[in-house]
Amino acid sequence: MTKGILGRKVGMTQVFTENGELIPVTVIEAAQNVVLQKKTVETDGYEAVQIGFEDKRAILSNKPEQGHVAKANTTPKRFIREFRDVNLDEYEIGAEVKVDVFAEGDIIDATGVSKGKGFQGVIKRHGQSRGPMAHGSRYHRRPGSMGPVAPNRVFKNKLLPGRMGGEQITIQNLEIVKVDVEKNVLLVKGNVPGAKKALVQIKTATKAK
């Protein structure tokens, strides 16, 4: 069954194992997760649990939103996400979801929005090779040929310069190194998409070996 939680990326640090091995980890703070709704096949056509994360001022929410969170006896939330393939009996509306749903050694998937890089060329954006930088070369970092003359157009999916980053990215099969229940913090091995303070969605890995 899937377990999930929402949090914010604090940054990266490192921890040492008992053998002295250094492990780079990402710190994810997962406070204020509240169950807002339990969706069932009878009422919604599918099973899922809806979780709200991080309070926001009531003046920033509309009446339907306020009525929805009132059923869970909580305040309006800034982020609302759903997790499918869950055991609905383990969740109660209005209950808080903490990091102790996970344990050390669990394999998870982390989803976030990657850092925006702005308008970038094909070398940085797609990893293409550059031309010679000297000896009379007039081709350095340009995209190169866009295709043959005959079609009179550029084919779809041609790798070209453009805006890079700012996309939803999921990194699969990351390991949880430590669970700090008191501070509601997860330490995840490796890097996680997004800048500092970015929203990160953590759930049980779908392709765990």
Curated annotation (Swiss-Prot):
GO molecular function annotations of the record: rRNA binding; structural constituent of ribosome
Region (Disordered): 126-148
InterPro entries per the UniProt record, alphabetical: Ribosomal_uL3, Ribosomal_uL3_bac/org-type, Ribosomal_uL3_CS, Transl_B-barrel_sf
Keywords: Ribonucleoprotein, Ribosomal protein, RNA-binding, rRNA-binding
GO cellular component: cytosolic large ribosomal subunit
Cited Gene3D superfamilies: 3.30.160.810, Translation factors
GO biological process assignments: translation
The UniProt record lists the keyword Ribosomal protein: yes
Any single Pfam family the record assigns to this protein: Ribosomal_L3
Oligomer and partners: Part of the 50S ribosomal subunit. Forms a cluster with proteins L14 and L19.
HAMAP family to which the protein is assigned, alphabetical: Ribosomal_uL3_B
Function: One of the primary rRNA binding proteins, it binds directly near the 3'-end of the 23S rRNA, where it nucleates assembly of the 50S subunit.
Family that this chain belongs to: Belongs to the universal ribosomal protein uL3 family.
Name of this chain's protein: Large ribosomal subunit protein uL3
Organism: Listeria monocytogenes serovar 1/2a (strain ATCC BAA-679 / EGD-e)
Gene from which the chain derives: rplC
